[in-house]
């Protein structure tokens, strides 16, 4: 299990954009399961939507991507890389995620060829599917990541 401070040693995300509270299962380079406890204090609930707070779907996908990045970048082969979103395919949202929900984020890493890879993600609340889809990512050396435009 990894706590937030350990996650931050692997990926660069920080508050308010770190969307994973802990990792509860991990097979380095292959898969991970993370948890996000969704609270009413999330900054995005201020405007999405007043009186009817719903976690934006794009942030659910970002949370899945962060879990996948932890699984991949924690593997010795990829520790010196930075992962970037390259695309999403077949994403479907099945239920809203609201304050008080515990989001379970499961990611299976697929093929990685050269510096491009895929992962399949599923987000659930109380066993009910909230979102799923395929994530595409690019792996770059940190210096290239800072200078790529």
Curated annotation (Swiss-Prot):
Primary subcellular site in the record, as a coarse category: cytoplasm
Active site, per annotation: 48
Catalyzed reactions per annotation: a (3R)-hydroxyacyl-[ACP] = a (2E)-enoyl-[ACP] + H2O
Pfam families to which the protein is assigned, alphabetical: FabA (PF07977)
GO CC terms, sorted: cytoplasm; membrane
GO molecular function, one term: (3R)-hydroxyacyl-[acyl-carrier-protein] dehydratase activity
Matching InterPro entries: FabA_FabZ (IPR013114), FabZ (IPR010084), HotDog_dom_sf (IPR029069)
UniProt GO BP: fatty acid biosynthetic process; lipid A biosynthetic process
The protein's role, per its UniProt record: Involved in unsaturated fatty acids biosynthesis. Catalyzes the dehydration of short chain beta-hydroxyacyl-ACPs and long chain saturated and unsaturated beta-hydroxyacyl-ACPs.
Protein family according to the UniProt entry: Belongs to the thioester dehydratase family. FabZ subfamily.
Protein name: 3-hydroxyacyl-[acyl-carrier-protein] dehydratase FabZ
